[in-house]
A protein has these predicted regions:
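Transmembrane alpha-helices and adjacent helix-loop boundaries
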Residues: 1-204
Length: 206
């Protein structure tokens, strides 16, 4: 027989702290996704640039982002930069690392979206007198975003999961706060169960 007495009232009393961690998680997820998308929107253009430096820079970024663990990227941001006297908070380290990772993956997602757009649209836009920037921003890019919406939502979900790695460097996002609270109250099941529900409810409609 299970000899465990559930004490949900303990969780209820500390629910504001859990929600504080959840808000931090959501904030990091949204910001890292926006920053990642903005960077990716530039990198995807540089991929086809005539400038070899820009092409190689983009290739290197994508390679590092996709072929190294996200945890290592966080370590490099937090501890690696510290070795050179650049000390940043755990919040900035996680935000920067997740945004860096997002940018690498989103660049490839956008590249696939651009490949699906007919070249005739470029010609039509030029026929209307639009320059390259206007064609990119007002004709091509909106269609690409619509095409890649589903893959981008998957990346958003990954970003939220990735923020939990912040616990390693002391960030009290949802997972970090949950671990801290259960260590104080010795109610691991209740706290982790509620944390899991918060994650699920945050992402279930995406």
């Amino acid at each position: 027989m299970l000899d465990y007495t559930f004490q949900w009232r303990v969780v209820w009393k500390r629910l504001p702290d859990l929600l504080e961690g959840a808000i931090l998680t959501l904030e990091l997820t949204i910001l890292s996704s926006i920053i990642g998308l903005l960077i990716a929107s530039i990198l995807v253009v540089w991929q086809k640039s005539d400038n070899s430096f820009l092409r190689n820079f983009t290739k290197t970024w994508i390679s590092i982002a996709r072929n190294t663990p996200a945890l290592l990227q966080i370590y490099m941001a937090y501890f690696g930069l510290g070795s050179f006297g650049i000390h940043i908070s755990s919040y900035v380290a996680v935000l920067g690392a997740i945004a860096f990772n997002n940018a690498g993956y989103m660049t490839e997602i956008l590249r696939g979206g651009f490949a699906s757009i007919s070249k005739n649209q470029n010609q039509a836009a030029k026929g209307l007198g639009l320059n390259n920037f206007q064609t990119y921003m007002y004709v091509i890019y909106p269609q690409v975003l619509k095409t890649v919406f589903l893959p981008m939502t998957n990346q958003f979900i990954w970003a939220m999961m990735g923020t939990s790695l912040g616990i390693i460097i002391g960030l009290q996002e949802l997972t970090g706060m949950t671990t801290f609270l259960q260590s104080q109250t010795f109610r691991p099941f209740e706290f982790y169960f509620i944390a899991a529900l918060i994650y699920i409810l945050s992402l279930i409609h995406i």
